[in-house]
Curated annotation (Swiss-Prot):
Function: Plays an important role in pancreatic tumor progression and metastasis. Promotes pancreatic cancer cells migration and invasion through the TLR4/MyD88/NF-kaapaB signaling pathway, without the involvement of the TLR4/TRIF pathway.
Residues carrying sugar: N161
Claim: Cytoplasm is one of the keywords in the record: yes
Source taxonomy: Eukaryota, Metazoa, Chordata, Craniata, Vertebrata
PTM comment, free text: N-glycosylated.
Domain Jacalin-type lectin: 17-149
Protein name: Pancreatic adenocarcinoma up-regulated factor
A molecular-function term among this protein's GO annotations: carbohydrate binding
Organism: Homo sapiens
Length: 172
């Protein structure tokens, strides 16, 4: 418990565990990847339901999560673009989603009808880093979103070498 509190205070991942939808079925979660960001998304929709989701982490697609079937829509994020807010619509299953990005773009998957909820990070500057939820044979029953800060870009500048001379006050 103390470890979780410490991580929260240090700006660790937001694991509030909020799930949208009625729930039930098998659990799923995207792979935890601390070296790559979400760079793309595939969502399969069929029979007015969201069947499955799949995220692209860096250059590789993670496993497809959810039920089989449906028509797949694919979105590729631009370099430096992140998902910053999501709207979801439920009846008995997830019916649709709208994902908003840091570059003022948005993507519709399915239809926004039923009970509509919004999901966004609790801290300014956080972005979508993972998706989790539950699914049954027909589609996704509940969905949740993990938020954290984007990865820092590695610096291209070489480290500064400090040298001290015998005449400098620091070198004495």
């Amino acid at each position: 418990m103390l470890l979780l509190l410490t991580l929260a205070l240090l700006g660790g991942p937001t694991w509030a565990g909020k799930m949208y939808g009625p729930g039930g079925g098998k659990y799923f979660s995207t792979t935890e990847d601390y070296d790559h960001e979400i760079t793309g998304l595939r969502v399969s929709v069929g029979l007015l339901l969201v069947k499955s989701v799949q995220v692209k982490l860096g250059d590789s697609w993670d496993v497809k999560l959810g039920a089989l079937g449906g028509n797949t829509q694919e979105v590729t994020l631009q370099p430096g673009e992140y998902i910053t807010k999501v709207f979801v619509a439920f009846q008995a299953f997830l019916r649709g989603m709208v994902m908003y990005t840091s570059k003022d773009r948005y993507f519709y998957f399915g239809k926004l009808d039923g009970q509509i909820s919004s999901a966004y990070p609790s801290q300014e500057g956080q972005v979508l880093v993972g998706i989790y939820g539950q699914y049954q044979l027909l589609g996704i029953k509940s969905i949740g979103f993990e938020w954290n800060y984007p990865l820092e870009e590695p610096t291209t500048e070489p480290p500064v070498n400090l040298t001290y001379s015998a005449n400098s006050p620091v070198g004495r």
